[in-house]
Regions:
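Acidic, low-complexity intrinsically disordered segments
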Residues: 1-243, 251
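Radical SAM [4Fe-4S] cluster-binding motif and immediate context
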Residues: 32, 177, 183-349
């Protein structure tokens, strides 16, 4: 089956002045590479399907380019992934344009926003056939096999006789090692001129990508959607599987990587195993990660630095203890000050 996967972005998000471009027109800033659709592409291809990806962070991939490809190639399924409310209107617009050129193709939404608002999204955007909830790897494999029988696919929201149907939730997948590495080779990233705008420049100016060693966070911050998306669970890949991907990136010429884990700094023994594996593998790439100030074992900072960790990003959220308490951050300013001192000494710079 031919599947198109699209990373939808608000065009204004990447609107940069001329000074923000290289002489060849490449962007000097951009957001993270879309690891979500790259992961789904790898899963589909391993199962024998054909997959084509489009990243609308690339100014060379506007709607009209995608629409023309749909007109020419006639995929059986088009999946759209978008980050938040700012991209949602553009996803709806693109779906309507898709419908204008191909009324038979099946269209699916996925992502955190779509998961947490699935019934409303299906109601407000009747042009979309399916809203996919939760992790997408096994779901999309099931969907391509049951494209004409959506009732058989767990985690799917769809419509029957004009009424929205929420299939039972899909069980949270614990075994993340079963999935292949993201399909980075099939998505053009040569328009990137530097690292993302939301990662400190201390990381690297080398060829850059992202990877994910774990999913979820056990905390319950009131502003965060991650616990709901992951059904309150935290899951991790084995350190051996993470190291295998790290070595794969190095062998393919990457000079920098950023862990997009929701809370990388959990389980000190796991962090230690990853860092020691990176060190033992010899010359390696620069990397960064993020986590909570109260989930860090400070004694591992020197080891992380030795393993070429260039930056650790903390979600401080507020300098007011009262505000932190209202946000249910479950952290104190004293703990923040303590970890900030260690971060400056050992990791950043």
């Amino acid at each position: 089956m031919l599947v198109f996967l699209i990373h939808v972005r608000d065009p204004q998000f990447y609107a940069v002045p001329a000074a923000g471009r290289a002489k060849n027109g490449n962007l000097r800033i951009m957001g993270f590479p879309p690891i979500g659709i790259m992961s789904l592409s790898a899963v589909l291809k391993r199962a024998g399907h054909e997959c084509v990806m489009f990243d609308q962070a690339n100014t060379e991939t506007p709607n009209q380019v995608i629409i023309e490809q749909i007109r020419m190639r006639r995929p059986q399924l088009v999946g759209l992934s978008f980050l938040s409310t700012t991209s949602y209107p553009y996803a709806r617009m693109l779906v309507r344009q898709i419908r204008a050129v191909d009324s038979k193709v099946k269209v699916a939404f996925g992502s955190v926003f779509a998961t947490l608002n699935a019934p409303l999204v299906k109601l407000h955007c009747p042009e979309v056939d399916f809203v996919c909830r939760g992790d997408g790897e096994q779901l999309i494999l099931d969907l391509v096999e049951q494209l004409d029988n959506p009732a058989a696919v767990a985690g799917l929201t769809w419509a029957r006789d004009g009424r929205v149907v929420n299939n039972p939730d899909r069980a949270v997948e614990r075994d993340l090692d079963q999935w292949p590495f993201p399909d980075r080779e099939s998505l053009a990233l040569d328009f990137i001129e530097s690292i993302p705008l939301d990662v400190p420049a201390a990381l690297s100016m080398d060829r850059y990508t992202t990877l994910q060693a774990s999913r979820g966070c056990p905390r319950r911050c009131v502003f965060c959607d991650i616990p709901r998306f992951n059904q309150g669970k935290w899951r991790s890949r084995s350190h051996q599987h993470v190291l295998a991907e790290f070595n794969h990136l190095r062998e393919h010429g990457y000079g920098a990587a950023y862990f997009v884990d929701d809370n990388f700094l959990l389980q000190p023994q796991r962090i230690k195993a990853i860092c020691k594996g990176i060190i033992d593998s010899g010359p390696t790439i620069h990397w960064g990660c993020e986590g909570r100030v109260d989930s860090v074992a400070e004694h591992l900072y020197p080891l992380m630095a030795k393993a070429n960790c260039r930056t650790v990003m903390f979600g401080i959220e507020s300098g007011s203890q009262q505000v932190l308490d209202r946000l249910k951050k479950e952290q104190t300013l004293n703990r923040l000050r303590k970890n900030d001192r260690f971060s400056v000494d050992y990791v950043v710079g």
